[in-house]
A protein has these predicted regions:
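Enzymes that bind and transform nitrogen-containing heteroaromatic metabolites
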Residues: 1-208
Length: 208
């Protein structure tokens, strides 16, 4: 099976992936999400300049250990960002070349505009969203106007502690079905020990 381009993102219940100014402080964390297991499903991550700058604004230079990070930008200088590939090429052509190589899946990280462009080009294979129990009322939408696709639900997980609902969809016509949600840790089931029965009282023998 060829590599899949998977769009994975957190989204509010009313369909926004960021606040009006790119804010991400509304994202809810849940200890059941195993990020190390999630990252092992990919060896390449791609994003646009805006998403990259929001990521680096929190510290660091955006490099991810064990992953090839590809950033599409016409203004960033490659020499300034070690460990990251800054490209000015057409993202559609780059994605097609990446998918032709051997390796794990490719993560399309954030960025509604890039998602719309690549979706319209027919190179996105899955849509995997973590729906947060949050209403923003305004912000950057999951999918700007201009692209449509039919989806098929592959898996879903509900995280009771936080109220997050994780949904994994295949895009019909894509390269294979979407994966099951394996990076959510199973709920721990504690076996209840049966209470020990009280010791039976010995009957006293009657004296003759």
């Amino acid at each position: 099976m060829s590599r899949r381009l998977r769009y994975g993102v957190a989204v509010t219940l009313d369909g926004f992936i960021a606040g009006p100014n790119g804010e991400y402080d509304w994202i809810v964390m849940d200890p059941a999400i195993d990020f190390a297991a999630l990252y092992k499903e990919f060896d390449t991550v791609i994003m646009g300049r805006k998403t990259y700058e929001l990521t680096t604004a929190q510290g660091g230079h955006g490099a991810m250990p064990g992953m090839e990070v590809v950033v599409f930008s016409r203004t960033l200088r490659p020499a300034t960002y070690p460990g990251v590939r800054i490209l000015n090429d057409d993202p559609r052509d780059v994605v097609k070349a990446l998918k032709a190589r051997q390796g794990r899946d490719i993560w399309l990280f954030g960025g509604g505009e890039m998602f719309r462009s690549l979706l319209a080009a027919g190179v996105v294979d899955t849509v995997e969203v973590a729906v947060m129990p949050v209403l923003l009322g305004n912000g950057i939408p999951l999918l700007p106007p201009g692209a449509t696709a039919k989806l098929k639900l592959a898996d879903q997980k509900t995280l009771p502690a936080s109220g997050i609902v994780v949904l994994s969809y295949s895009i019909l016509g894509g390269a294979g079905s979407a994966p099951r949600v394996r990076y959510v840790k199973p709920a721990k089931t504690r076996s209840k020990k049966k209470a020990a029965a009280p010791p039976k009282k010995k009957k006293k023998k009657k004296a003759r």
